[in-house]
């Protein structure tokens, strides 16, 4: 969900999910947080072994809460040559309040935001797990 960079897109995805949930069905997803993106900040990372090497250039705009990164991979082929792959990604750090509003706007009920241990998410949580529920639409009757 972090790849959705606009609030309206988050609402639309939640609406689409809600359309396909069974009555009282559960929607569970995870998000990287502002805390996580701040922790990696504007840094470069690299690693190499015999089969794959990568360079990751990261940039986090704290005001917009947009994380941008360029990733260059070198993957060894069967003939021992390396093929280069370049990728560019943007992700957004939505606040829990934004997610709650998007879920409620889409017609679902926001249940909780927890960390990897099942405890309530805090400002220091790197990845938050969101749990929402469909409100209980009436199932279609047999024809």
Where are these regions (language model features)?
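A short glycine-rich, Lys/Arg-flanked "PGG" loop and its adjoining helix->strand segment in the class I
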Residues: 10-26
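C-terminal lobe and adjacent flexible extensions of AdoMet/dcAdoMet transferase-like proteins
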Residues: 90-143
